[in-house]
């Protein structure tokens, strides 16, 4: 028996299904929910996207020309932490241990997927390095993250700027038996003196 879905519901479900981790059934549930909302709540939801832009400096999402982090006078502008996405900025900020600024690439190099340097915010990064002492490569430890970090390092090091990479290791509170081989190898390579 075929399921009847009206055109507006199908369109809404199709859009929700584009979100990461949302399958067709969840997308349909979200679409039903959204279509039952009062119109003003739907408009508030839609307007949330309207006020978002990229920070002129770091390319993070913001509601102003220069984000709060870049405009914070207490931040060390001489250290830039390069990340893949705005979600990574949020993760670092939750940790509370970083006092520099960020640069969001909005992706990683991935020749297999057709993502090249021109598709990322690399030109913007290179344009803000004049007074920078250190660039921290905080891309994910995937093939694409490593390739992006190496590519950027080769561009930045000739400028006399220190380029570092996040250490790899074991997550706090985890057991060795659950760590994968690469994590254990990197943890051994990056061990520190007590």
Where are the regions a protein language model picked out?
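Conserved, well-folded catalytic cores of nucleic-acid-processing
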Residues: 19, 37, 48, 61, ...
């Amino acid at each position: 028996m075929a399921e009847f879905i009206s055109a507006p519901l199908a369109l809404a479900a199709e859009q929700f299904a584009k979100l990461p981790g949302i399958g067709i059934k969840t997308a349909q549930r979200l679409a039903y929910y959204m279509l039952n909302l009062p119109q003003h709540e739907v408009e508030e939801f839609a307007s949330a996207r309207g006020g978002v832009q990229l920070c002129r400096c770091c390319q993070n999402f913001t509601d102003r020309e220069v984000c709060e982090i870049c405009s914070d006078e207490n931040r060390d502008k001489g250290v830039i932490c390069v990340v893949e996405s705005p979600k990574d900025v949020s993760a670092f900020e939750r940790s509370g241990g970083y006092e520099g600024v960020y640069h969001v690439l909005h992706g990683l190099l991935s020749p297999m997927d057709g993502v090249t340097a021109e598709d990322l915010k690399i030109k913007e990064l290179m344009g803000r390095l004049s007074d920078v002492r250190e660039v921290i490569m905080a891309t994910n430890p995937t093939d694409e993250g490593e390739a992006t970090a190496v590519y950027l390092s080769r561009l930045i090091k000739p400028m006399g700027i220190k380029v570092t990479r996040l250490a790899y290791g074991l997550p706090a509170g985890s057991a060795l038996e659950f760590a994968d081989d690469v994590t254990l190898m990197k943890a051994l390579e990056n061990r520190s003196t007590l």
